[in-house]
Regions:
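Conserved Rossmann-fold NAD(P)-dependent oxidoreductase catalytic core, especially the SDR/UDP-sugar
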Residues: 28-30, 81-82, 88-144, 149-154
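Substrate-binding strand-loop-helix patch
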Residues: 184-193, 212-232, 241-252, 289-293
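NAD(P)H-binding glycine-rich loop region in Rossmannoid oxidoreductase-like domains
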Residues: 37-41, 45-101, 105-108, 120-124
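N-terminal Rossmann NAD(P)H-binding glycine-rich loop of SDR-like oxidoreductase domains
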Residues: 2-31
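Flexible, glycine-rich beta-alpha linker
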Residues: 126-129, 149-170, 185-186, 220
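A hydrophobic C-terminal alpha-helical subdomain
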Residues: 245-319
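Substrate-positioning beta->alpha
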Residues: 162-164, 181-203, 210-213
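Glycine/proline-rich active-site loop of Rossmann-fold NAD(P)-dependent oxidoreductases
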Residues: 158-166, 202-212, 218, 234-237
Length: 319
């Protein structure tokens, strides 16, 4: 019998990858989205007919959400925000209160598995509201549904991301690019396909009650990441370290934008490395190492940011 997966946050890069993976392996998927007309078609195209159902609902409409749990075997929460917005999109609501609601429903309806996507590095970043809300969410989940498995990925990248693609767009346009904290913050970028494989492994092996840190094969500083991206798109740019007071001032200005490039809270996060803490199991420990090399993967789609785009004939300097 095919198992039924209920996914929250299915329209993002991780959600779309996961829907394809699950439906190819005969799982039936129900995806909750707040805007059916805006996101429904993009989600629907990720799977064959009959394997996916899309429900339009506000995630805090508990009456509507509750009805979906009666036939749910596996609940997956991929919802997260990087900055606070309007209409109740606060860190506390999205990262703390909503996961708590899901955990209680999972317990009430005896759901077999609850998989929650958190974030790496949150234990150290105690001065960040983002990190505090993520930790609160994890605590609420463990309190209400002890069988839940929590995944903590480092930065996730792919052609559909808002990480490498945003950086390459900015590096294309700006002659000078700022380095916060001298660009020394380390990340362990994990490809979206690898993270999807890890989630599928947790489901198929029926893993419970774990916190798993999910990382790629390399620890790379932000400065190194920017240099690799510049090399891939054949650009020379000046990378300038910013004093903290200047960085904080730019964050104050940027966070006034509808889609801020940087906020004060994100600046706090950048003080801390986003790599394995070694306090919890890693994806390698559960037999799912990520082998995709950052530069090799980005090379597959970076041509869109080179001069000439897909028709670019100039090869980048691999040295």
């Amino acid at each position: 019998k095919a198992k039924n997966c209920l996914i929250f946050g299915g329209s993002g890069q991780i959600g779309r990858h996961l829907i394809r993976k699950l439906t190819k392996n005969n799982y039936k998927v129900t995806v909750v989205t707040r805007n059916l007309h805006q996101k429904g078609y993009a989600i629907k195209t990720q799977a064959n007919a009959g394997y996916i159902d899309i429900v339009e609902a506000n995630i805090f409409d508990e009456i509507k959400i509750r009805k979906l749990f009666s036939k749910t075997d596996i609940c997956i929460n991929l919802i997260g925000i990087l900055y606070e917005g309007k209409k109740g999109n606060t860190f506390k609501n999205i990262h703390s209160i909503f996961p708590s609601i899901l955990a209680k429903l999972c317990k009430e309806y005896k759901v077999q598995q609850f998989i929650h996507l958190s974030a790496l590095g949150i234990n150290n970043a105690i001065d960040s509201d983002y990190a505090k809300s993520k930790l609160e969410g994890e605590a609420n989940i463990k309190k209400n549904f002890s069988l839940a498995t929590i995944l903590r990925p480092s930065v996730v990248y792919s052609v559909d991301d808002k990480f490498t693609t945003s950086f390459m767009t900015l590096l294309n346009r700006l002659p000078v690019f700022p380095l916060y904290y001298n660009g020394n913050t380390k990340f362990a970028p994990i490809h979206c396909s690898d993270l999807t494989d890890i989630i599928y492994h947790v489901i198929s092996k029926n893993l419970h009650s774990k916190i798993i840190e999910c990382v790629g094969p390399e620890d790379i500083s932000l400065k190194e990441i920017l240099k690799k991206l510049l090399q891939l798109i054949n650009k020379n740019r000046i990378l300038i370290p910013l004093p903290f007071f200047v960085a904080n001032l730019t964050a104050k200005v940027f966070q006034l934008l509808p889609n801020p490039l940087l906020t004060e809270d994100q600046l706090k996060l950048l003080k801390y490395d986003n790599i394995l803490s070694k306090k919890y199991q890693s994806n390698s420990d559960i037999g799912m190492p990520s082998l995709r090399i950052f530069k090799e993967e980005v090379e597959k789609y970076c041509y869109m940011w080179r001069e000439g785009g897909q028709f670019s004939t100039k090869k980048y300097n691999k040295s």
